[in-house]
Amino acid sequence: MDFQLQAVDDNARAGVLNLAHSQVETPVFMPVGTQGCIKSLDAMDAQEILGAKLILANTYHMYLRPGEKVVEQLGGLHRFAQFQGSFLTDSGGFQAFSLSDNVKLQEDGIVFKSHIDGSKHLFTPIKVLDIQYSLNSDIMMVLDDLVGLPAPLKRLEESIKRSAKWANMSLEYHKENNRPNNNLFAIIQGGTHLKMRSLSVGLTHEGFDGYAIGGLAVGESVDEMLETIAHTAPLLPKDKPRYLMGVGTPENILDAISLGVDMFDCVMPTRNARNATLFTHSGKISIKNAPYKLDDTPIEENCACYACKRYSKAYLHHLFRAKELTYARLASLHNLHFYLELVKNARNAILEKRFLSFKKEFLEKYHSCSH
């Protein structure tokens, strides 16, 4: 993997990630395709309509169903899903903790029960890499010990030491395997405790292809999250991409870009879409509300998304009320277009050295009204 930093505006960064299956401009928002597809969308929607170059899939889910060996036998995740861009896969540790009963944390990994059939499994740092090799992920995440917040200092210290140990084991194993098309990212932990974040960075070896700031958006306040990002991002190598995992709102993303973050993922645009909340530059609207029953205008005037070019709010309102599956597709296409355009416009502003004014103007309009 090659990462080229093209411009810096204050702390905001614009760059290019050259991966085996695509060239990705940063800042980048990655739509979440947990099971190998974005919910309600297929690969053509992702690449042809949205223009997405990099999407996220989930190691835990692909391992349990259909199984990584099935995916490998069918040509890897790209061929299986017919997606011509790149895949980032997370390690599955978060899902093992959050979806399983009776999770047991061990020094060598995580023991968990499948949420599908109750079968028992062990994820180790090596095993999750082998799974991701079978999937042929462009970017692989190391297994980490994620802590919900608030958490005692002792638990945070255990987490960062274990996460760093697992990350460094993963790096050594990855070097032995000599797979240049499968890039490995480390994950920095430490909750909102700034000294713990510094310690996590110090314990994690150099030599990873990128670095993620993990363990946020798990119960802390927005101010605590931003303070943690502001402290952690400058500690990471300047010549490597920085990934903020699982965050978040349009405001969160712009704030994190201003603090030097390059990569984002979140289920918010698609989950909100399915639950009737649509993003516009003037704030969010709830398409299920009665005023939209006779509204013949698009979700947002001047929006170039597939849904806005073809359909009215009244039609979307009807589809949602009728529980039609087509609603989820159209609403998800709109919300993802909004997110992808947001980071694209942020990137252009960084290249033109006007990011702070762009951010200010966007937020002023975005907070002007919601319906």
UniProtKB/Swiss-Prot annotation:
Pathway: tRNA modification; tRNA-queuosine biosynthesis
Residues at the catalytic site: 90, 265
Coiled-coil intervals: none
InterPro entries, per the entry: TGT, TGT-like_sf, tRNA_ribo_trans-like
GO MF annotations, alphabetized: metal ion binding; tRNA-guanosine(34) queuine transglycosylase activity
Keywords: Glycosyltransferase, Metal-binding, Queuosine biosynthesis, Transferase, tRNA processing, Zinc
EC number(s) from the headed UniProt entry: 2.4.2.29
Catalytic activity: 7-aminomethyl-7-carbaguanine + guanosine(34) in tRNA = 7-aminomethyl-7-carbaguanosine(34) in tRNA + guanine
Domain of life (superkingdom): Bacteria
A Pfam family that the UniProt record links to this protein: TGT
Signal peptide feature range: none
Manner of cofactor binding, per the entry note: Binds 1 zinc ion per subunit.
Disulfide bridge partners, by residue number: none
Reported cofactor(s): Zn(2+)
Any single Gene Ontology cellular-component annotation: cytosol
UniProt region (RNA binding), positions on chain: 246-252, 270-274
SUPFAM superfamilies (alphabetical): tRNA-guanine transglycosylase
Binding site for substrate: 90-94, 144, 189, 215
One BP term from GO: queuosine biosynthetic process
Binding residues annotated for Zn(2+), in chain numbering: 303, 305, 308, 334
Similarity remark: Belongs to the queuine tRNA-ribosyltransferase family.
General function of this protein: Catalyzes the base-exchange of a guanine (G) residue with the queuine precursor 7-aminomethyl-7-deazaguanine (PreQ1) at position 34 (anticodon wobble position) in tRNAs with GU(N) anticodons (tRNA-Asp, -Asn, -His and -Tyr). Catalysis occurs through a double-displacement mechanism. The nucleophile active site attacks the C1' of nucleotide 34 to detach the guanine base from the RNA, forming a covalent enzyme-RNA intermediate. The proton acceptor active site deprotonates the incoming PreQ1, allowing a nucleophilic attack on the C1' of the ribose to form the product.
Quaternary assembly: Homodimer. Within each dimer, one monomer is responsible for RNA recognition and catalysis, while the other monomer binds to the replacement base PreQ1.
Protein name stated in the entry: Queuine tRNA-ribosyltransferase
Name of the gene encoding the protein in the UniProt record: tgt
